[in-house]
């Protein structure tokens, strides 16, 4: 057995559940605020970092939306994405499907093209300079209405070359997937892959709705699926990927102790699970930190860690030929060397 942290570090990884706005570190938030003439409610980077030690969901959301307010120009969005991509490159992340929340910006008067162009330019530079490949997944904010989501989808159509999928995030409880069935149907017709946050705080039937009414290709979170044996059987039978976010679940009190995180039960139930960081700047860890956390808390062995990391590539929306090449590269990188 190699050193656990070293084993995690050398694993090639893909990240499928990362909200790019949630990667905004305090230093960059201050830099962008200064560049755009915005006064933050904190006197220093250290004071802001202390505020990141929140204990309630609302405290997180307040910080999250304040962070969004410093993003004004295409260069701001580029810098945000580039900072994340450079950081995860150092963690041996090879591929990313990056969530972004356009409604959180267009509602502030920021043009859709401003954010989309900045993010796509960063992804292109990361592929060329870092060999980190990535695509965008546009997420609708579920606390807004479906008509607003429809308008956002209209704006996304000009960016189908760079936006791979459509997702659903924000406050889950009280906003079931069924609220968005029409816009998801249209997104599917337009050729987008589909994902949705479901079963994090919301009940298991939200996962059923995401599967049967939205027709998603992947479930984001899905923790509470374990409360419904029939749902677990369905997820296992269909090999439906779940993008699990351990440190996020801990910080938002979805679980009170990582030793009781459902990832272990998911694996034991034969579910197709990936590990991800969600909003890493706010939740205390990027992808490697999430892997190390569950390795320690759940006593995952190297074979399990390897399988979960491989799942990240297998569950991705890469074209089949790219996926086959990525999986072959993953397997060869971990083969014993003579």
PLM features: residue spans?
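Short HxH-centered metal-ligating active-site micro-motif
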Residues: 197
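Metal-cofactor-binding active-site regions of metalloenzymes
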Residues: 1-192, 201-206, 213, 217-218, ...
């Amino acid at each position: 057995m190699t050193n656990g942290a070293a084993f995690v570090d050398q694993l090639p990884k893909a990240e499928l559940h990362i909200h790019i706005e949630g990667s905004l570190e305090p230093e960059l938030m201050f830099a962008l605020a200064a560049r755009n003439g915005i006064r933050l409610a904190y006197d220093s980077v250290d004071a802001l970092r202390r505020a990141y030690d929140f204990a309630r969901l609302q405290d997180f959301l307040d910080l999250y939306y304040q962070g969004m307010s410093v993003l004004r120009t295409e260069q701001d969005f580029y810098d945000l994405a580039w900072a994340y991509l450079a950081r995860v490159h150092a963690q041996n992340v090879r591929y990313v499907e990056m969530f972004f929340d356009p409604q959180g910006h267009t509602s502030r008067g920021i043009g859709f093209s401003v954010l989309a162009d900045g993010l796509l330019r960063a992804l292109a530079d990361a592929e060329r300079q870092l060999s980190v490949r990535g695509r965008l997944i546009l997420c609708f904010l579920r606390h807004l209405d479906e008509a607003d989501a429809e308008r956002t989808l209209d704006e996304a159509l000009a960016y189908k070359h760079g936006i791979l999928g459509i997702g659903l995030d924000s406050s889950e409880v009280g906003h079931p997937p069924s609220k968005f069935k029409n816009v998801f149907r249209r997104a599917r017709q337009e050729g987008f892959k589909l994902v949705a946050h479901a079963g994090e705080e919301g009940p298991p039937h939200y996962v059923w709705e995401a599967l049967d009414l939205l027709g998603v290709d992947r479930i984001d979170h899905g923790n509470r699926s374990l409360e419904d044996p029939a749902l677990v059987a369905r997820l296992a039978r269909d090999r439906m990927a779940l993008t699990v976010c351990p440190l996020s679940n801990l910080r938002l009190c979805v679980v009170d102790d990582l030793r009781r995180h459902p990832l272990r039960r998911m694996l034991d139930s034969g579910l197709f699970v990936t590990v991800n960081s969600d909003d890493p700047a706010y939740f205390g860890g990027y992808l490697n930190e999430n892997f190390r956390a569950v390795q320690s808390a759940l006593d995952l062995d190297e074979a399990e860690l390897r399988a979960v990391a491989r799942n990240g590539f297998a569950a991705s929306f890469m074209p089949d030929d790219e996926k086959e090449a990525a999986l072959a590269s993953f397997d060869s990188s971990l083969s014993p060397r003579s």
